[in-house]
Design a protein with these regions (language model features):
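A short SAM/SAH-binding and catalytic strip from SAM-dependent methyltransferases
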Residues: 156-167
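A short glycine-rich, Lys/Arg-flanked "PGG" loop and its adjoining helix->strand segment in the class I
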Residues: 170-182
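Conserved beta-strand signature within the Rossmann-like core of class I S-adenosyl-L-methionine
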Residues: 184-190
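Conserved class I S-adenosyl-L-methionine
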Residues: 6, 14, 19-76, 91
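Class I SAM-dependent methyltransferase SAM/SAH-binding core
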Residues: 83, 89-146
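Core SAM-dependent methyltransferase catalytic element
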Residues: 221-241
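A short acidic, Gly/Pro-enriched loop at the edge of an enzyme's catalytic core
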Residues: 145-156
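Short alpha-helix
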Residues: 199-213
Length: 241
């Protein structure tokens, strides 16, 4: 059953990816800094990215949310504030709020994605249902290198499939360290550099992660082949100091 679900999600993701690839081919690439582009997909094509995220990566968010919730309970048992960096259309933040009751904030550079995330959280997005007003995640536009939050604002910072897009990983991780309270935790899930063609123009995060408590996980909890190897994770954690 799990294998079948993965195959179906993969096929759906490929179909959406083909549509988006045609869109990119017609309209060109985004800025070199990563603005206007998310992994070769124009962020302006918000509906296509939302569909791809839901279908291709949706099965990952359940285990990831459970892991984040466990860490949140460990570091702040009386109630944790969680920040998702690079939230996109908000699927993980919504799950953290709905299933785990966490006070969650999502940050993304693209205003269209923030609009999509807010709509999804309010129940306009297919399949989410409605959240009580007090449990709605907050979604804000901002750059990981200069976040609109005070020092020590969050107990847990999580990022999924975002770090390889950051124009300046060192600046981003320094900001995460700033907004993370003492004793807080950072969790990162990502593809290893070089797995996908567009990774060749992305900065390598290894060596640029000093200054924050960092836990780097593979692309999924199941350690699929495109996740970071154990050696790569050790190197990145060592580089983070």
């Amino acid at each position: 059953m799990i294998l079948l679900g993965a195959v179906v999600a993969c096929a759906a993701g490929i179909a959406v990816g083909r549509h988006v690839a045609r869109h990119v081919g017609r309209h060109g690439r985004g800025a070199a800094t990563g603005q206007g582009e998310r992994g070769g997909i124009l962020i302006g094509d918000t509906a296509a990215y939302d569909a791809m995220s839901r279908l291709f990566f949706g099965s990952l968010f359940g285990p990831i949310a459970a892991d984040v919730a466990a860490v949140a309970e460990e570091v702040a048992p009386d109630g944790a504030r969680v920040l998702e960096v690079g939230c996109g259309p908000g699927h993980l933040s919504i799950r953290l709020a709905r299933r785990h009751g966490l006070d969650t904030t999502g940050l993304d550079l693209d205003p269209a994605m923030i609009g999509r995330a807010r709509a999804n959280a309010e129940g306009a997005g297919e399949g989410f249902g409605r959240l009580p007003p007090g449990r709605l995640p907050s979604f804000l536009m901002g750059d990981v290198a200069s976040m609109p939050f005070g020092d020590g604002s969050f107990d847990v910072v999580v990022s999924t499939l975002s770090m390889h897009h950051w124009a300046d990983p060192a600046a981003g991780l320094a900001e995460i360290d700033r907004v993370l309270r003492p004793g807080g935790r950072t969790l990162v899930w990502d593809f290893r550099r070089g797995f996908l063609p567009f990774h060749g123009r992305m900065p390598d995060p290894v060596g640029h992660t000093r200054g924050t408590p960092l836990r780097l996980v593979g692309a999924t909890p199941w350690r699929w082949p495109w996740g970071f190897s154990l050696i790569q994770r050790i190197e990145l954690v060592r580089a983070s100091g």
